[in-house]
Amino acid sequence: MTDVPIKYRLIKKEKHTGARLGEIITPHGTFPTPMFMPVGTQATVKTMSPEELKAMGSGIILSNTYHLWLRPGDELVARAGGLHKFMNWDQPILTDSGGFQVYSLADSRNISEEGVTFKNHLNGSKMFLSPEKAISIQNNLGSDIMMSFDECPQFYQPYDYVKKSIERTSRWAERGLKAHRRPHDQGLFGIVQGAGFEDLRRQSAHDLVSMDFPGYSIGGLAVGETHDEMNAVLDFTTPLLPENKPRYLMGVGAPDSLIDGVIRGVDMFDCVLPTRIARNGTCMTNRGRLVVKNAQFAEDFTPLDPECDCYTCKNYTRAYLRHLLKADETFGIRLTSYHNLYFLINLMKNVRQAIMDDNLLEFRQDFMEKYGYGKNGRNF
């Protein structure tokens, strides 16, 4: 590929781990890495305004190709001037390929060499998504970073199935590259698959690196495997990817997974976790997970997280948040969502500083102890 709109600049490597401090330059601005990306499934991060996301330090957000294709339609978004104008967001946007949603949401999937036939989860109509169509949709959306169409096999699928799957994903990636109409202003990433099989991850990475994408994603994780299994896959996968290009771990947002991914050389992460759990009153704090809807907080007039300086924690008490959530007030969801997003974005800011100071392992140990990991199993 000759025109590369996405560039990675390495600033510093951490002395004791594979972590790296850098920045990614896109047509809509530059953001620091490692970075957690809030997910705006339907062209909005649930309950958050663009101004709030900018204020908390979100340098890039993610939107979902599958959902925007179905509603309101990628051609409508193109007529609006692209996703940035449509949602009034002037910073970088990443779109996924739609593949994961097809496999996780849609019914009656039929995978062939041409693509995937499935039922629309909204109205049951029959639809078809191919590598070329996934690229066309994302070209219409106009995201800065877009994803190749891939199959995301379950982590514990048999070896023979996963081998056929990654070989097809490589062929789909090549087809997507050929179909890409806007290589001058949209960077297309290849997605490494292979479940937990090292040789298949190696084969997948080799195939994709030979195609010279401007960046690479690691897919097929955070789909039911253990934390240790995820780390093991990252241990043998990230070294296969070029050092001069971004590395994106898809669908990961638990604090320990973010830190451990950074230690293994990952630059970008996304997950719906912070906003999804916030809607149920579950909040991440510096002292671990807290379910603010619980009765014990009915008369707790302290901040949600006394160690956090976000808008929610500076202005509202646990008792008030509990009241809002119990009364089904949208403002309560806004406040808990703001806090959880701020928490992860600020965590990554602190991780970047730890890389600069060459003390990421000490940072990890201190964070894990305070958060409560290991006391009652994993505690996201």
From Swiss-Prot:
Gene Ontology, cellular component aspect: cytosol
Annotated active site: 96 (proton acceptor), 270 (nucleophile)
GO molecular function: metal ion binding; tRNA-guanosine(34) queuine transglycosylase activity
A UniProt-annotated Pfam family: TGT
Binding positions for Zn(2+) per the UniProt entry: 308, 310, 313, 339
Residue ranges that the Swiss-Prot or TrEMBL entry lists as coiled coil: none
Domain of life, source organism: Bacteria
Enzyme Commission number(s) from the entry: 2.4.2.29
UniProt catalytic activity: 7-aminomethyl-7-carbaguanine + guanosine(34) in tRNA = 7-aminomethyl-7-carbaguanosine(34) in tRNA + guanine
Co-factor(s): Zn(2+)
Subunit structure: Homodimer. Within each dimer, one monomer is responsible for RNA recognition and catalysis, while the other monomer binds to the replacement base PreQ1.
Sequence similarity: Belongs to the queuine tRNA-ribosyltransferase family.
Matching NCBIfam families: Q_tRNA_tgt, tgt_general
Function of the molecule: Catalyzes the base-exchange of a guanine (G) residue with the queuine precursor 7-aminomethyl-7-deazaguanine (PreQ1) at position 34 (anticodon wobble position) in tRNAs with GU(N) anticodons (tRNA-Asp, -Asn, -His and -Tyr). Catalysis occurs through a double-displacement mechanism. The nucleophile active site attacks the C1' of nucleotide 34 to detach the guanine base from the RNA, forming a covalent enzyme-RNA intermediate. The proton acceptor active site deprotonates the incoming PreQ1, allowing a nucleophilic attack on the C1' of the ribose to form the product.
Protein name: Queuine tRNA-ribosyltransferase
Gene that this polypeptide is encoded by: tgt
